[in-house]
Amino acid sequence: MAWKNVIASGDIPVSPELVWLLVRDFCGKWHPAISTMGAEHDKSGRLLRVFTVHSQDVVYRERLTWFSDSDRSMSYTHVEGIHGVEIYNAQLLVSNNKDGGARITMTAKLLAPDPRDEEIAIGTKKIFDEAIIEIKKLTKLPMPLQAPSNSNFAYDKPIQTFAFGDTPRLAISHIGEPSETLCLFLHGIGGNKSNWNQQLASVAPYVQSAALDLRGYGESTLGEIQSNVDEYCDDILSVADRLGALNLVLCGLSYGSWIATSFAMRYPNRLSALVLSGGCTGMSEALPEEREAFRLSREVPINEGKTPADFSEDLLPVISGPDISNAIKVELLNSMQAIPTETYIDALKCFTNPVEKFDFSKITMPVLLMTGEHDKLAPPDEIRGVAKRIFETAPEPDVRFECVTGAGHVCNLENPNSYNTALVDFIMRVIQ
């Protein structure tokens, strides 16, 4: 057997954004060959489209493996229906063409015995060509101006805050009805649980949600020893037990993303999904001398007798985007200025002493990665690269990547509407 590659492309004189709105629904019934179309979810929440075509009795199933509104791309894999194929992976991409319009590119890579491989390749090319012709026709009809959003439903109950335990004492904000699944938010090294209030309210209509003050932050206390990632994972399990949750959707920002991924390495069976914002690998892939240099540079103001409150304004330009509002500036400053020096040092030592390099083949759950358009600490190209690595390494990938427009490092605060739209859309799918 040998690999066969199929490619088809075409230009359309309308914007790529409008073309993407037409085709972004993986289970959309727009192709002229489709007779029936439906959606299914496997036990891990992965999305499959189930369809039949005209003049055939065959049922086809394809599973979504990659999706990005930001990059206007999706990838999928064959599950059932194509006789004789061993592997069949395909992609649809909508990009800018040189004339200011849209270019649609559809590709497939397949493996099947000879001569069946050639038959499948010819059939695929025909399907792709028909798709591009149909899309050109559809762009001449009235179209929606934006993708549907599920993030604007209000939840009419307030966020409740409480603490439990002794050393450490863990404080959480909680909202939503008790359920087997909990969406737990983990803040960054300069934040606290209140940074997630807008996300808690957006997610609560669909699943119970909580935000944790990490050890030493906000209303939580430090433990008896230097914090490490295993203790953070124990804290996550403690919160889940306290709220009666068997399964978790972990949503982290920066330092919290690194902790969330560390949890995924240890307890993949407890995770329904993983949401990583403004980070993932932390310093786990940096050389020892790079980690040490990073730690020492961050400790300079501390060694000069300053507290986080003293140097928070110096950090603000590093973590914020160019269009940050005054209200969000104040919120970020308040978060950073509230960090005790002891807590800052504790988190810094933990962050710069990772115990492992992540093995993305252990990622068995759906993953959403987001970062701000203007994030200097976790730039879009870097996080897109991490997303691609997970896509290429995970045994059954289900990866989504989004770049949050206009936002800096704390993208959930700077552009909550875009952030919440992607988050809620993702959560609604994976907790089916």
Briefly describe each language-model feature range.
Residues 168, 173, 194, 198-201, ...:
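Active-site loop/oxyanion-hole signature of alpha/beta-hydrolase fold enzymes
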Residues 1-43:
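Hydrophobic ligand-binding cavity/cleft-lining segments
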Residues 285-292, 305-361:
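Conserved alpha/beta-hydrolase catalytic His-Asp/Glu region
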Residues 395-432:
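Catalytic active-site module of serine/aspartate enzymes centered on a nucleophile-bearing elbow/loop
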Residues 363, 369-371, 375:
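Short beta-strand/loop motif that positions the catalytic acidic residue
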Residues 108-150:
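A conserved amphipathic terminal alpha-helix motif
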Residues 261-266, 271-304:
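Flexible "cap/lid" loop of the alpha/beta hydrolase fold
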Residues 31, 40, 54-101, 109-111:
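Hydrophobic-ligand binding "helix-grip"
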